[in-house]
Amino acid sequence: MSNRMWGGRFASGPAEIMEEINASIGFDKRLAPQDIRGSLAHVAMLGKAGILPAEDVAAIEAGLKSVRDEIEAGTFAFKRELEDIHMSVESRLTEIVGPAAGRLHTARSRNDQVATDMKLWVRDTLDSLDQQAADLQRALADKALKHADTVMPGFTHLQSAQPVTFGHHCLAYVEMLARDRGRFRDARARLNESPLGAAALAGTSFPIDRHATAAALGFDRPTANSLDSVADRDFALEALAAASICAVHLSRFAEELVVWTSAQFNFVRLSDGFTTGSSIMPQKRNPDAAELVRAKSGRIIGALTGLLIVMKGLPLAYSKDMQEDKEGTFDALQALSLCLAAMTGMVKDLEPNAEVLARAAGSGYATATDLADWLVRELGLPFRQAHHVTGRLVGVASAKGVGLEALSLPEMQEAEPRITEAVYAVLGVENSVASRTSYGGTAPDNVRRQAQAWIERLG
């Protein structure tokens, strides 16, 4: 007979390669705090329900706390032959308290146990990510307030489009992160039902109190269907989906920082703390932190795709395939945590090059829309006609190699005879930015109000 905890049915133990492919302790030991929390709630409920005698409950509780202390102290020996964190904890518990440890698994399966552990871990991690995203929002809002008047080019198709302010650009990411945090909280709310007590898949014949264990572990309620309880990994998928969208936002910002810090743009300067040098080129200051944020977004998205593919073909309820939920989820959410921390540090330290930004804001005929708007407002032209007139003037200026503001009034009047000297007032980038006073626009006063509102909201 096999000496495994599940080995009564087997005449011999598993092959060595079976042990290797089956073991998850190398990565699921991360679930130790959650596993012990779940076991403490479970054994307390078993005692209150009269399923276990008080002396066994007390011994098991004391033993679990001893195991927890060993793990926290780094003295706990994790063994591959014990497969996973559940068997590892129970094996050590047996060594500490003896046969009473075997009663802990009454009315419980590893199926509902691991689902509970994973939900607790994902919930804890979502809470942490929410706080990290808020930290990045604060850094961005502070930077936005400081640079509400710093004019820069706004881009479409990575071509100069209209002037905006650096503060306005920062606030765009504050808004994205607000949606990310909303998704973290939505995912948390949906996962907050306890699968503990669903057992293998059909529930249990013991008179357990699932509402009690749910409350003890901070869940809103127990799950309503035992099959779904152990088959569900939606909570991990939702967390990974939310993480992936957040990672996309961080990657877009990271890409901008990589471009903006190049000598060709020179829009911003990152501190030495977030750049590295070259082993051969002494002049280099490489934006490695931003590049790694950009790269790790691919890893995070890959974890979501991987788990979707694992889950798509599984019949109810539990299959060993679901063991593959952990490494990708752990890695992706840890990677996002690292990216949020790195991006927060970069934002706090970076400084925009205001002179370069202002010059760039005036290039590429970025005030052409302001000219078209002036033609509509002051001369009453339909916008499409104003667009056409402005396009002609851009063509003239481009042929001469000058900006719109350098065209003479007679040259302007060749395209539209009613144009007056007053038109030149709208061709400066500062005036252009100041005129964008619509709600959500880039006018500096708007930016200051929005930045201050976010700073107050974030605390």
Curated annotation (Swiss-Prot):
Disulfide bonds: none annotated. The keyword Amino-acid biosynthesis applies. Keywords: Amino-acid biosynthesis, Arginine biosynthesis, Cytoplasm, Lyase. Its EC number is 4.3.2.1. CDD domains: Argininosuccinate_lyase. One of its GO terms (biological process) is L-arginine biosynthetic process. Transmembrane segments: none annotated. One of its GO terms (cellular component) is cytosol. It catalyses: 2-(N(omega)-L-arginino)succinate = fumarate + L-arginine. The keyword Cytoplasm applies. Gene3D superfamilies: Fumarase/aspartase (C-terminal domain), Fumarase/aspartase (Central domain), Fumarase/aspartase (N-terminal domain). Pathway: Amino-acid biosynthesis; L-arginine biosynthesis; L-arginine from L-ornithine and carbamoyl phosphate: step 3/3. It holds the Pfam family ASL_C2. GO terms for molecular function: argininosuccinate lyase activity. It is found in: Cytoplasm. PROSITE patterns: FUMARATE_LYASES. HAMAP family: Arg_succ_lyase. Belongs to the lyase 1 family. Argininosuccinate lyase subfamily. This is Argininosuccinate lyase. The gene is argH.
